[in-house]
Amino acid sequence: MSSQPPPLPWLDPNQDFPPTSQAWDENSPAPGLLAAGGVLDVETLRRAYSQGIFPWYSEGQPTLWWSPNPRMVLQVANFRLRPSFKKKIRQFCQTPGCEIRIDSAFEQVIEACASSARIGQSGTWIVPDMRAAYGELHRVGLAHSVETWVNGELAGGLYCVALGKAVFGESMFSRVSDASKIALAALIGFCRHHGVKQIDCQQNTPHLASLGAGEISRDLFLKGLAAGLAEAGPAWEFDRRFWQQLLTPESMST
């Protein structure tokens, strides 16, 4: 018979988060749940992410804060690039009108992520308060969008949070087949070039696992997080040369 989880802490504005070790365990109704309440502002989100905590809740719920154990993480060196997708990236790089942009349409990206249908989900966790809060994070340089553009149209992309060299993937969308995967591959090339070691994926999904992500213990994740936080962050600009982190120089030739 499973034991009852401990009472869930309710946070007042600007109150410190509980230790992540106090998050509900795998035997609870909501493994990884740490606290509720608080405020969604830049400083609270910065403190949360720097401790391995993130918000995730649905419309009508209070703000819920999570720190799962284990944690889904994509080690940048382990990104799985299948030959067929490598060919698609090469074609993308060589096709006029196809390009990667960073931070040119953050609000469009997060709105598209919020409105994208998800298998097994009837709504979205990217509720209006979340969109507004992450928009503020973007304005202060702590949230970024990686965008796939085709002939001047936004075809897909993703957004993430970045503190130093600690990167946290949030959500992605596609309007054209594989456009979000191309944006993720661009982020991987960017991260490899700048020495970013891991991308936090938060929750386990088969899609992320197929790309090379895997679960690690919370303690191991927090060690990697601390290492990333200790380093100065890169300039969030994309250079076509970053593709060479995924493709050989010969692959880039025309």
UniProtKB/Swiss-Prot annotation:
Q: Does the keyword Hydrolase apply?
A: no
Query: Which key words are in the record?
Result: Acyltransferase, Cytoplasm, Transferase
Which Enzyme Commission number(s) are listed? Answer: 2.3.2.6
Report biased composition (Pro residues) as residue ranges: 1-10
Q: Which class of enzymes does this protein belong to?
A: transferase
Q: Which family does it belong to?
A: Belongs to the L/F-transferase family.
Q: What's this protein's name?
A: Leucyl/phenylalanyl-tRNA--protein transferase
